[in-house]
């Protein structure tokens, strides 16, 4: 099978790290294609960044339809554009935050998230609430480091994750830790050994969910909510999004 992993930001070095994590998790017969959109922010650390990343994500989903892709993974812990992406393809589309919290719910009664800057705490609280996990997620723990800081200074990054992970276990009574950024994938295994609880990387979780859905032969329902968008004109910078719209399959 062919899985397209979309890093919604435009930092190619981060995409390479995501690609490595995805390929490490995937089966030997699964082809991983990791990409960044041609347009979007260098990192996603605010609502503004998130919303401006979505057109690039949708563009990559549409390209995937022509590339023979069997499933898509949106590799950002905000799951930007997830629902819109499901409208423009019948292939499975999974987000790494969604995959992480559902996997964690099968491994632990309660768990905490460790992520980047404090400003995104409310964003992620709202996100896990939308997945029905507000009673399972004990805390969204943040660090002073931005998304790209983990790429620039991995030693400082893992130390921050180690500190907040320990606090999550000792103070929150978390029984699992979720790494709340796609750029944290390389730290999961060592943190799990140190903390003594499951540590879940969303890229790995997303790839395994995508493989499973394809294996089961399931596709996105097109009955109502995720049916193809109605054809209409889009103008200005969005002009191309109105061309060749699919309404049936």
UniProtKB/Swiss-Prot annotation:
Residues the record marks as site: Seems to be responsible for L-isomers recognition and racemization: 181
InterPro entries: Asp/Glu/hydantoin_racemase, Hydantoin_racemase-like, Iso_Racemase_Enz_sf
Enzyme class: isomerase
Keywords assigned by UniProt, alphabetized: Amino-acid biosynthesis, Isomerase, Plasmid
Example GO molecular function: amino-acid racemase activity
Site feature (Seems to be responsible for recognition and proton retrieval of D-isomers) residues: 76
E.C. designation(s): 5.1.99.5
Family the entry assigns: Belongs to the HyuE racemase family.
Role played: Involved in the asymmetric conversion of racemic 5-substituted hydantoins to the corresponding L-amino acids. Catalyzes the racemization via enolization of D- and L-5-monosubstituted hydantoins. Is able to racemize 5-substituted hydantoins having aromatic or aliphatic substituents such as 5-(2-methylthioethyl)hydantoin, 5-isopropylhydantoin, 5-isobutylhydantoin and 5-benzylhydantoin.
Subunit details: Homohexamer.
Protein name as it appears in the record: Hydantoin racemase
Name of the gene this protein is made from: hyuE
